[in-house]
């Protein structure tokens, strides 16, 4: 025991001497860092100041600081990590995802990525390098290519038709109050799960109610723990006092068990199906060393987490804005009636001929990006962002929400004006799906399902607000920024609807 105590004392003394020498002789040169808000405290830095909603708090900080670069970059100390927050489109597009795109293509490592994200090996969390490039190539070609998306057109078409039929039965030709969020969630969950597994989990013709509840709970739990990180990620000593990592470990075990079950079910079937898991298992036979079960589970995880809540939230915000702007919904309906007609449902192939509908989707993504703070990036080496030095290891947060409401970038930025996107170059300013080599590869799928669902709802029903007051547009708490008050609206089927869905 005495020998152990002596070793501890000696280790402490040598560690202290090393720190003193390092500080005196290896002190880094003074760097030009972006301005930082007051209120920094030892150990925790600015963590105590980050009140939800974080994207609004960060914009508030940024607006109070003097920026010699014309605005848009500030620094924070979050525990042991240096974090830069960018709130300028010019800086994000030119400096971060232009000139420094490769340097900033890394991801900071967080606890949930380790225990739920298969030790940071999935496409979102993986460090930039050969493994990530292989994953990106796999997803681009085998999952999100035009060919693969077209293979699942029947799923999107069928799920939207089921949504329309469900609403038609509820409302009929009489004005009826409906709550839309549960139906929109069912739509997006079923779309992704049918692509991956061939199963409908929600609504009619479902296969396993208990498994459906399990899926939704897992997605909610992972989403609740996924953002820019937990305080434990920034102040490692908190691991000694927090149960966070143990909770995440348990969540990772539950998630892995569920995903492995999906793969085993498909592997046990005698005939090869047409789902995404079937396709990945065929690829596994050709290269078993690369297409491991872990790789496949990571892909399923990202598809489910990134492709369900986000699209449902976008649809709910879009409908909320339309109800507050009846002139916009009238204009969109006229466009659909003129170009599609009244004798058939809108189809995905029609979307390219409906520019105003597309502009409504873009304007919704501008005002209500489902990920207001883009997935964090990390500098793999020293670089410069404008006139500022960015040391290696710095975390980068891009506040897409603030950029989308920046008056230096947008005219009347807080107003809902789909017409602004009649100028094609305006769409290039959007950051809803990120920029650069780590932009979201699933943007095409998201825009297809949102465009088709929204167009169908406009085409098939007349919509009104409940009461005379405008729809409440307050933001709720959550990683994908849902509405604080779920949307309820008055719905009435248009006279021709029963003919085209019978």
Swiss-Prot record:
One GO MF term attached to the UniProt entry: heme binding
Membrane spanning residue stretches: 6-26
Enzyme Commission identifier(s): 1.14.-.-
Residues annotated to bind heme: 440
Cofactor(s) in the UniProt record: heme
Keywords: Heme, Iron, Membrane, Metal-binding, Monooxygenase, Oxidoreductase, Transmembrane, Transmembrane helix
Family stated for the protein in its record: Belongs to the cytochrome P450 family.
Name of the protein in its database record: Cytochrome P450 81D1
Top-level taxonomy: Eukaryota, Viridiplantae, Streptophyta, Embryophyta, Tracheophyta
Gene that specifies this protein: CYP81D1
């Amino acid at each position: 025991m005495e020998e152990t105590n002596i070793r501890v004392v000696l280790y402490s003394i040598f560690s202290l001497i090393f720190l003193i020498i390092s500080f005196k002789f290896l002190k880094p040169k003074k760097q030009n860092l972006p301005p930082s808000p007051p209120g920094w405290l030892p150990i925790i830095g600015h963590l105590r100041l980050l009140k939800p909603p974080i994207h609004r708090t960060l914009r508030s900080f940024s607006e109070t600081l003097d920026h010699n670069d014309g605005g848009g970059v500030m620094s924070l100390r979050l525990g042991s990590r240096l974090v830069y927050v960018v709130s300028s489109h010019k800086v994000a597009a030119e400096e971060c995802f232009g000139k420094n795109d490769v340097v900033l293509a890394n991801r900071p490592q967080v606890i949930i990525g380790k225990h739920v994200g298969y030790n940071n090996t999935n496409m979102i969390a993986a460090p930039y390098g050969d493994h990530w490039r292989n994953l990106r190539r796999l997803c681009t070609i085998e999952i999100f290519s035009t060919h693969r998306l077209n293979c699942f057109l029947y799923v999107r078409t069928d799920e939207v038709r089921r949504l329309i039929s469900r609403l038609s039965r509820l409302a009929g030709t009489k004005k009826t109050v409906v709550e839309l969020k549960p139906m929109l969630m069912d739509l997006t969950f079923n779309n992704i799960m049918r692509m991956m597994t061939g199963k409908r989990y929600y609504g009619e013709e479902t296969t396993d109610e208990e498994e459906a509840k399990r899926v939704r709970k897992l997605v909610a739990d992972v989403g609740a723990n996924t953002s820019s990180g937990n305080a434990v990620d920034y102040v490692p000593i908190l691991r000694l006092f927090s149960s966070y990592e143990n909770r995440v470990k348990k969540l990772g075990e539950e998630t892995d068990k569920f995903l492995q079950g999906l793969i085993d079910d498909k592997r046990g079937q005698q005939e090869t199906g047409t789902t995404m898991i079937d396709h990945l298992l065929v690829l596994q036979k050709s290269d078993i060393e690369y297409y491991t079960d872990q790789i496949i589970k990571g892909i399923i995880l990202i598809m489910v987490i990134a492709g369900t809540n986000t699209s449902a939230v976008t649809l709910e915000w879009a409908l909320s804005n339309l109800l507050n702007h009846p002139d916009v919904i009238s204009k969109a309906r006229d466009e659909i009636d003129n170009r599609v007609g009244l004798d058939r449902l809108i189809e995905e192939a029609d979307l390219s001929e409906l520019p105003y509908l597309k502009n409504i989707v873009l304007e919704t993504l501008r005002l209500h990006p489902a990920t207001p703070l883009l997935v964090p990036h990390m500098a793999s080496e020293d670089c410069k962002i404008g006139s500022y030095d960015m040391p290696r290891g710095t975390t980068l947060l891009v506040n897409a929400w603030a950029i989308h409401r920046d008056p230096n970038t947008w005219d009347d930025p807080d107003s809902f004006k789909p017409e602004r996107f009649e100028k094609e170059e305006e769409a290039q300013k959007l950051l809803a799906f990120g920029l650069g080599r780590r932009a979201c590869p699933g943007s095409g799928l998201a825009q297809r399902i949102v465009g088709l669902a929204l167009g169908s709802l406009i085409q098939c029903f007349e919509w009104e607000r409940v009461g005379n007051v405008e729809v409440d547009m307050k933001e709720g708490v959550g990683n994908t920024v849902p509405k604080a008050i779920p949307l309820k609206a008055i719905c009435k089927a248009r006279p021709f609807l029963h003919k085209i869905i019978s």
